[in-house]
Amino acid sequence: MNLPARVRVTRPPLPLAPALKAAAGRLCPDAPEALTGAALAIAGGGVIGAHLRWDGGEAANVETGWRGRGIEEALAQAVSG
C-alpha cells in the first residue's frame, strides 16, 4: 500500500507506552484501557492515526489533514494482521 513518504504504520506492543497511550486516546477517546490490538500511524515524530481494538469493539481515527491518503486502510490492515 502506498503511503505518503513521511508516514509509517506500526503495531506497538501492548500495553501501550504512556506517550502512545495519550496520543491514541486523543484520537480514539472512547477506547478502554484494555486493548487487544493497536496500529498507529506516525509522521514527523507524532501519532497522526490510530486503529484500536478491544473485546467487543474497535475505533479508528486519522487527523483531518491526513485523511484520504490510504492511512485508514493501512491501519485497518495492520491491526488485523
Task: State the predicted function of each range.
Residues A34-H51:
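Conserved beta-hairpin
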Residues G68-G81:
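Conserved acetyl-CoA-binding loop-helix of GNAT-fold acetyltransferases
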